[in-house]
């Protein structure tokens, strides 16, 4: 079920999680939940992260055999969710047929601190204050872009190396609106899930601010 409420002349998307959704953070683990829990553990998810992000799974229904990661808006309502298979289904991701123009897990973002823009939801759970762009080009009309411009936090960007052109377009638009942007150099052939916490912190500390005078050179590399 999708509902909407008008706020600042904008419709806030609210949806329901699948009826079959079961949480993986309650401490009550049965045979069905052990398999998705093992999958998350192998991917480096601690119990604290599973609890914080309210990660669950579905053992039946449309999302059978899938991990469910909900997104909560700033009021605590579910605005979206991502589902990823933990079995050998050919289709890795299957998400609800609703708009992705949201700030994923806005409820958990501290806009007074630096944010990090990343590609996908699993990347965003790597560290605090990471926001996935969900495949978006982050145009000026998107909710996430407008919120970044409004709050103007120090902004890091760490997209996959194969998304370089899209990354530069996003950086260019943000700089145009006066947002300070630092580029984290993700190693070729890797994404954030392949990088240790120590390595990520090192890359973040050495990230360089992108300015107009260097942007043209970077775009034409």
Label for each model-derived stretch:
Residues 117, 152-166, 185:
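Acidic beta-strand-to-loop metal/phosphate-binding motif
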Residues 66-67, 146-152, 191-207:
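Short, surface-exposed amphipathic charged segments that create phosphate/polyanion-binding patches used
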Residues 40, 76, 157, 192:
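A residue-level signal for conserved active-site and pocket-lining positions in enzyme catalytic cores
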Residues 59-154:
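Phosphate-handling DNA/RNA-contact segment within nucleic-acid enzymes
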Residues 126-127, 166, 191-192:
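Phosphate- and divalent-cation-binding pockets in alpha/beta enzyme and binding domains
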Residues 165-178:
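Short, aromatic/basic amphipathic alpha-helical patches
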Residues 1-68, 72-75, 109, 149, ...:
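TOPRIM metal-binding catalytic domain and adjacent DNA-binding surface shared by DnaG-type primases
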Residues 135, 181-190:
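A generic structural motif
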